[in-house]
From Swiss-Prot:
Protein name: Calcineurin B-like protein 4
Sites marked Involved in dimerization: S140
Bilayer topology annotation: Lipid-anchor
Record has Metal-binding as a keyword: yes
Subcellular localization(s) per the UniProt record: Cell membrane
Length: 210
């Protein structure tokens, strides 16, 4: 009897109590439980081991498991807090919390900075910004000329690099975001505010009504 019970209630890899995650994030307990269902769908979509691998992450959030994209890679890497190549449930909830409309702007600002700081130096350099702009355009299927991309990069640096050292530090980035709030528009996902009702219509469309 005891063996059957332990199998029935075996917890998946990286399981954390919803109440604990709710206390540490912007989500409510009910929202965390809804995210658990979403996580289960994602983590069993390809490899089926209860962990989210990069292919599954890209398929769910970026609609493509094979197309290489720097933006998708960066988001995955930042969600993978343990740096072990997979996203566990706790990592998924904590990282996704940053995108909640009610998450503090300071958290969104810090996450966006890390997104652009490709080499983890603590600064955003011109080449890093250029690479991310190109990746974001590619993800959106938008195509700009090389001159237009350079203009975006140069304009950003002319506004953000206040001390003129050729790179953007966290303080400069914070001031830039305050002056240009639209720069964080991709850091809020409105459906997370209604996750218990909206799930899972925003991802995994082909599997949402199994």
């Amino acid at each position: 009897m005891g063996c059957a019970s332990s199998k029935q209630f075996k917890r998946p890899p990286g399981y954390e109590e919803p109440a604990v995650l709710a206390a540490q994030t912007t989500f409510t307990v009910n929202e965390v439980e809804a995210l658990r269902e979403l996580y289960n769908k994602m983590s069993y979509s390809i490899i089926k081991d209860g962990l989210i691998h990069k292919e599954e992450f890209q398929l769910a959030l970026f609609r493509n498991s094979r197309k290489a994209n720097l933006f998708a890679d960066r988001v995955f890497d930042l969600f993978d807090l343990k740096r072990n190549g997979v996203i566990e449930f706790g990592e998924f909830v904590r990282s996704l919390s940053v995108f909640h409309p009610k998450a503090p702007k300071s958290e969104k600002t810090a996450f966006a900075f890390k997104l652009y700081d490709l080499r983890g130096t603590g600064y955003i350099e011109k080449e890093e910004l250029r690479e991310m702009v190109l990746a974001l355009l590619d993800e959106s299927d938008l195509h700009l000329s090389e001159c237009a991309v350079e203009a975006i990069v140069d304009n950003t640096f002319s506004q953000a690099d206040s001390n003129g050292d050729g790179r953007i530090d966290p303080e400069e980035w914070e001031e830039f975001v305050k002056a240009n709030p639209a720069s964080l528009r991709n850091m809020s996902l409105p459906y997370l505010q209604d996750i218990t009702m909206a799930f899972p219509s925003f991802v995994m469309h082909s599997e949402a009504h199994d």
